[in-house]
Amino acid sequence: MVSVILRSRNEERYVGFALQSLHDFFGYDLEIVLVDNESTDNTIRVVNSFEYLNIKKITINKNDYTPGKSLNLGLESCNGEIVLCMSSHCQITNLNLDKIQAKLKDNVAVWGKQIPIWDGKKVSRRYMWSNFKDVDQTNYFCELENRYFLHNAFCFYKREILIENLFDEKYSGKEDRYWVNDMINKGHQVYYDSEMICNHFYTDNGATWKGIG
């Protein structure tokens, strides 16, 4: 079974796309852990409408929130051997679980391609990060950031690895980059699967494409 950690904060606009795509690709053999950062909109109402899915809901205090703390909290409720960290404003469009499981035998994480979407329209390619390429890679190094790269908006992990190597809770963002650089420095590998694809709806201020979302 796969466990999914969804982080949310006022995601009424997109969380339904995320949940429907999870059901489309995994069916009912799925455990979803929603870690909600005190949403004030209809996020929880939308989530509750997916009553046929196995969804656990956890609330984290907005004044105590960091991405790493939210993910670590969600991990405590995960039972699957494989954990998918996914943004509540992402929608899976292509995924081969057999390939991902095979790659996780030699890699501690497998992350995928993101397509930026705004109001149902794809953003021009000039807005796309150079990091989401069309070729699979091991231990991808981002020249722009001058460090190894991985993105928690759409990334599979081995649960046992995450339990032993939690995300650093002090960072306000890019906890995934700090994690992957630490793991590679310890001798581990991570894999970028260019055929594992999601739509990533970016926020009003473009935060997703600044590395915040």
Please identify what each model-predicted range represents.
Residues N61-C78:
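Glycine-rich, basic loop-to-helix element that forms the pyrophosphate-binding segment
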Residues Q137-Y157:
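A recurrent flexible, glycine/aromatic-enriched loop bordering the glycosyltransferase active site
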Residues Q189-G211:
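Active-site donor/metal-binding and catalytic loop motifs
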Residues L95-R125:
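Conserved donor NDP-sugar-binding/catalytic core segment of glycosyltransferases
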Residues Q20-D29:
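Short, acidic, metal-binding catalytic loop of nucleotide-sugar glycosyltransferases
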Residues D36-R45, C90:
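A conserved acidic beta->alpha catalytic loop
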Residues S172-W179:
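Acidic donor-binding loop at a coil-to-helix junction in glycosyltransferase catalytic cores
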Residues V83:
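Short aromatic/hydrophobic "clamp" motif used to bind/position activated sugar donors
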